[in-house]
Amino acid sequence: MMARLKVPEGWCVQAFRFTLNPTQTQAASLARHFGARRKAFNWTVTALKADIKAWRADGTESAKPSLRVLRKRWNTVKDQVCVNAQTGQVWWPECSKEAYADGIAGAVDAYWNWQSCRAGKRAGKTVGVPRFKKKGRDADRVCFTTGAMRVEPDRRHLTLPVIGTIRTYENTRRVERLIAKGRARVLAITVRRNGTRLDASVRVLVQRPQQRRVALPDSRVGVDVGVRRLATVADAEGTVLEQVPNPRPLDAALRGLRRVSRARSRCTKGSRRYCERTTELSRLHRRVNDVRTHHLHVLTTRLAKTHGRIVVEGLDAAGMLRQKGLPGARARRRALSDAALATPRRHLSYKTGWYGSSLVVADRWFPSSKTCHACRHVQDIGWDEKWQCDGCSITHQRDDNAAINLARYEEPPSVVGPVGAAVKRGADRKTGPGPAGGREARKATGHPAGEQPRDGVQVK
């Protein structure tokens, strides 16, 4: 796996996104780089699968997969792999070496994610064997980490290896003035296709100011996110400070999306009108995403700059989207997706570090909505927006009550164990009956279960 960047004390990694305005020649060159990355990724997946197959067949072992090892193998075969089928011309010199390195690194990371998941060391969703990337299905993107890449001093252009200097729609002064002052250094520039546009994300190492930038360092607030409101902010004294309305960008664009989707369904796939409708559909989806992203960034930045301690819920957003069979479940899932409930916590997790505030994530099972903030009585309230407490007869608004309870949330005492120890997949579960040898013993590969996680990889 690729080595992680060690961020020095007082520094952090930030990304600045700009929309590119390339010429036709530059757009064609970027498209070639997208394809070159896919080619290198697919070749790496093929090589890794061949190594696994050889190990399973006769026990042939290979070196531990890494970017360095596989890049050397790629350099020995690229003259045979990157050949135009019609002209027989070798085309790999037309693209920067960074495109091929990015594809190989992506495949290596995907391989180790799969192996870590099989070994039970990776949290999150189950990850399978790396799959091949296909044009039209895979997101077009390429990352440049070395070479002639920079933000031009004129604040209107970015320079990329091989491709050259590309004009941007937005002014790049946000990052250029940091670089000019010596407070930032460019680490990588990633170009990706976003609908009908090309976006460049400039990842930089930024030196943060040492002084606290929080307006109210002693303020302690709870933030409840939801569908009715984007966020409700309250303090521990029971005062609701802010009620942020939900822009509902998907609901606003749903009528147009349906109209364009129906029009495209009546077109012949691959025709001119079909491509026009697809472009229009992409623009609408991009608009929805941009509106949602803008409101979430404005909200989370304001919270991180204003309050010293912010408490949010540890929601299982993915689990909430799996609700099926209930009345109105489809519309509810769409509304939950439109609200992006997990995004504010993700934004606050790094923005609080930037501005000197702190973030506390409440326990997933903390009953913030159904606990009366006056008498602490807990009762089932269903989906009701307003409810009356059976203990003290006070009527509560669901979101306001949850925000107040979150502001009063106290972190439980830490368990005995090594500091920073992560809970691995299944480590917090009780053991139960199962087949001898565990999950790997059920795989009929003809090899002992203990040898399976490595799949022919010799760890040196």
UniProtKB/Swiss-Prot annotation:
Signal peptide: none
Pfam families per UniProt: Cas12f1-like_TNB, HTH_OrfB_IS605, OrfB_IS605
Residues in coiled coil: none
Family, similarity comment: In the N-terminal section; belongs to the transposase 2 family. In the C-terminal section; belongs to the transposase 35 family.
Keyword list, A-Z: DNA recombination, DNA-binding, Endonuclease, Hydrolase, Metal-binding, Nuclease, Transposable element, Transposition, Zinc
Residues at the active site: 224, 313, 399
Segments of this protein annotated with the region Disordered: 415-460
Name assigned to this protein: Putative RNA-guided DNA endonuclease Rv2885c
Any GO CC annotation of this UniProt entry: plasma membrane
E.C. no: 3.1.21.-
Keyword Ligase carried by entry: no
Binding site for Zn(2+): 372, 375, 389, 392
Function: An RNA-guided dsDNA endonuclease. When guided by an RNA derived from the right-end element of its insertion sequence element (IS), cleaves DNA downstream of the transposon-associated motif (TAM). Cleaves supercoiled and linear DNA in a staggered manner 15-21 bases from the TAM yielding 5'-overhangs. Binds reRNA, an approximately 150 nucleotide base sRNA derived from the 3' end of its own gene, the right end (RE) of the insertion sequence (IS) plus sequence downstream of the IS.
Single Gene Ontology MF annotation: endonuclease activity
